Amino acid sequence: MRALIQRVSEASVTVEGELLGEIGPGLLILVCAMQGDGEDQASALAARIAKLRIFKDEAGKMNRSVRDTGGAALVVSQFTLAADTSRGNRPGFSAAAPPADGERLYRHFAAEIAACGIPTATGRFGADMKVRLLNDGPVTIWMES
């Protein structure tokens, strides 16, 4: 699985004008299941992100996790993280998991983040979503499992 993690002051996701999820301080996690991924990869990535120390401590160093700060997570599916731009001008997405697998793993990943004790909001898999965020830092991290 691939994830793009952004430290945010706030973030929200809407579909067709309906607010699906919003958080205050925490993480916006854009996530994509890849061909061959399974629940083990989703669980491992969620556990790593839950422990990722990218929030400042009292000394101003990135030494605290979202869980340590009492922050939340907004998990949004984004198959375009599987883009192959090595040839031509149009990205290919054949490395992404098939939609049924992608949705199952997206839901599993979000549930694993929540199981780590992090309040979790989600988007809607496969929908045309509008994501708003206020970056904090900015801090943006790319992770794979």
Curated annotation (Swiss-Prot):
Subunit structure: Homodimer.
Listed InterPro entries: Daa-tRNA_deacyls_DTD (IPR003732), DTD-like_sf (IPR023509)
Function of the molecule: An aminoacyl-tRNA editing enzyme that deacylates mischarged D-aminoacyl-tRNAs. Also deacylates mischarged glycyl-tRNA(Ala), protecting cells against glycine mischarging by AlaRS. Acts via tRNA-based rather than protein-based catalysis; rejects L-amino acids rather than detecting D-amino acids in the active site. By recycling D-aminoacyl-tRNA to D-amino acids and free tRNA molecules, this enzyme counteracts the toxicity associated with the formation of D-aminoacyl-tRNA entities in vivo and helps enforce protein L-homochirality.
Domain statement: A Gly-cisPro motif from one monomer fits into the active site of the other monomer to allow specific chiral rejection of L-amino acids.
Pfam family, one: Tyr_Deacylase
GO biological process: D-amino acid catabolic process
A GO cellular component annotation in the UniProt record: cytoplasm
Reactions accelerated catalytically: glycyl-tRNA(Ala) + H2O = tRNA(Ala) + glycine + H(+); a D-aminoacyl-tRNA + H2O = a tRNA + a D-alpha-amino acid + H(+)
Motif (Gly-cisPro motif, important for rejection of L-amino acids): 137-138
Family: Belongs to the DTD family.
Localization per Swiss-Prot or TrEMBL: Cytoplasm
Keywords: Cytoplasm, Hydrolase, RNA-binding, tRNA-binding
Gene3D superfamilies (UniProt xref): D-tyrosyl-tRNA(Tyr) deacylase
Main location: cytoplasm
Entry protein name: D-aminoacyl-tRNA deacylase
Span of the signal peptide: none
